[in-house]
């Protein structure tokens, strides 16, 4: 079944991305899956795509806010600055909030935005240590320039037992799908219904979107 993830909530001209308003607007438009960006700054988990200025931090939505609808949603969480130095404090803070909100872990997809596979491997180990081996981990891929890049990614996913991949949708074609047939793809950011249908025909089932609402989707 296809999942449409509201990309940073369902923003509009007057409703900013990664805001409580964009979360609620996503719900109103029928989304039951959401993608959002998280920063760990000043010991706080706050939401914004680009790194916020110090003066912004207290005015932004926080991590807890985005679980307002509890287990009605699936959550694709893009951790923007999760690294080896802050991982323990960040992940413990995340666990505390998820426990308090009683969120089912099988509805959470952890997607640290780390394209250095050596660092990503270390972070995935830390996440599994805290949340268990069954936690949904998403690797991230922005580009694949050469066949060697493809093989490196393939080896990384296999070695680390990663079943999910977040990837720019224009990279995906039939050849790509053949090479990663055992991997569940999370495509971003798909705003054209024709392109979504093309990807569906290739077997892709998870999409981040700014424009396509669930009512327009016919499974």
Regions found by a protein language model. Name each.
Residues 1-219:
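Phosphate-group recognition and catalysis centered on beta-loop-alpha active-site segments
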């Amino acid at each position: 079944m296809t999942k449409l993830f509201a990309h940073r909530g369902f923003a509009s001209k007057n409703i900013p991305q990664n805001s409580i308003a964009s979360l609620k607007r996503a719900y109103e438009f029928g989304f039951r899956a959401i993608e959002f960006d998280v920063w760990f700054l000043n010991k706080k988990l706050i939401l914004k795509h680009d790194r916020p200025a110090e003066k912004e931090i207290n005015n932004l939505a926080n991590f807890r806010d985005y679980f307002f609808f509890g287990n009605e949603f699936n959550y694709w969480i893009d951790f923007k600055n999760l690294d080896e130095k802050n991982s323990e404090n960040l992940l413990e803070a995340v666990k505390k909030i998820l426990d308090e909100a009683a969120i089912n872990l099988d509805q959470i997809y952890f997607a640290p935005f780390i394209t250095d596979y050596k660092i990503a491997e270390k972070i995935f180990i830390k996440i599994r240590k805290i949340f268990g081996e069954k936690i949904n981990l998403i690797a991230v891929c922005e580009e694949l320039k050469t066949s060697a890049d493809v093989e490196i990614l393939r080896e990384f996913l296999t070695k680390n037992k990663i079943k999910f991949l977040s990837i720019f949708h224009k990279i995906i074609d039939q050849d790509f799908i053949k090479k990663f047939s055992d991997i569940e793809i999370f495509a971003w950011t798909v705003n054209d219904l024709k392109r979504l249908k093309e990807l569906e025909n290739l077997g892709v089932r998870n999409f981040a979107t700014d424009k396509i609402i669930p009512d327009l989707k016919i499974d």
